[in-house]
């Protein structure tokens, strides 16, 4: 999200001391979930999506199927600039809180749909189209989440601690990394490669729904930033 309202309200004030944990949680939990979803997709693209969504290419050359799978992964990066502009615009219009909730739901719903998506053998080329749409939605959600979370953290920060507060959302990325790879490693060692290829790869995507519910609970409890509230009053 953009911060056009920030300059007009430099004296908005610091957060109360007892609200600091809520600020940290609200700014970090969403980023952790968004990157968890993103890393789950990267793991699946590297390990499973080639044979599931591009079986003909994988049969001819496994590396070719994997390459096609990574092309769907790249769709997210093409969608991110659009997501930044979209959520930046509405972040200044309707508020940081609302747009962060929408960003989290966008990423969460699209990730959950990937976990339910039939492969090429069931839906044909339509499965690839839906996969790319979901991946684009993930990119849009991630773009709005990361920048918006940083804005929420810094706009709630005391004037002399904005850099410190701004670092909190970035801590969510490694948390998402360890959760995604840790869960996939646990499932692979427990279920085995055959079961993972058949259906186990879906579990991390479906588990995202639980994380999103937790994230939404945190987000819905937060209030608008003092800088945005002051800008609305003016």
Feature map (PLM): residue ranges:
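Symmetry-related core transmembrane helices of the 12-TM Major Facilitator Superfamily/SLC fold
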Residues: 198-217
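C-terminal ends and interior cores of transmembrane alpha-helices
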Residues: 55, 105-124
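Hydrophobic core of transmembrane alpha-helices in multi-pass small-molecule transporters
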Residues: 117, 122-143
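Extracellular/periplasmic helix-loop-helix junction of adjacent transmembrane segments
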Residues: 45-82, 100, 125, 129
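Glycine-rich segments within core transmembrane alpha-helices of 12-TM secondary carriers
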Residues: 161-188, 210-212
């Amino acid at each position: 999200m953009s911060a056009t309202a920030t300059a007009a309200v430099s004296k908005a004030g610091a957060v109360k001391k007892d609200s600091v944990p809520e600020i940290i949680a609200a700014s970090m939990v969403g980023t952790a979930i968004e990157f968890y979803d993103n890393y789950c997709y990267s793991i699946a693209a590297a390990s499973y999506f080639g044979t599931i969504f591009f079986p003909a290419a994988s049969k001819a050359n496994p590396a070719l199927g994997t390459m096609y799978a990574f092309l769907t992964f790249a769709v997210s990066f093409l969608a991110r600039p659009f997501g930044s502009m979209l959520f930046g615009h509405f972040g200044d219009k309707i508020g940081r809180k609302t747009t962060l909730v929408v960003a989290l739901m966008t990423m969460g719903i699209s990730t959950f749909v990937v976990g339910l998506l039939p492969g090429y053998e069931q839906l044909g080329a339509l499965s690839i189209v839906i996969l790319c749409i979901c991946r684009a939605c993930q990119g849009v959600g991630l773009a709005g989440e990361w920048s918006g979370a940083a804005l929420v953290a810094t706009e709630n920060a005391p004037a002399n601690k904005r850099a410190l507060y701004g670092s909190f959302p970035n801590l969510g990325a490694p948390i998402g990394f360890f959760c995604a790879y840790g869960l996939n490693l646990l499932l692979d060692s427990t279920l085995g490669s055959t079961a993972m290829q058949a259906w186990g790869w879906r579990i991390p995507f479906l588990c995202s729904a639980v994380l999103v519910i937790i994230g939404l609970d945190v987000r819905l409890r937060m209030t608008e930033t003092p800088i945005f509230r002051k800008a609305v009053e003016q």
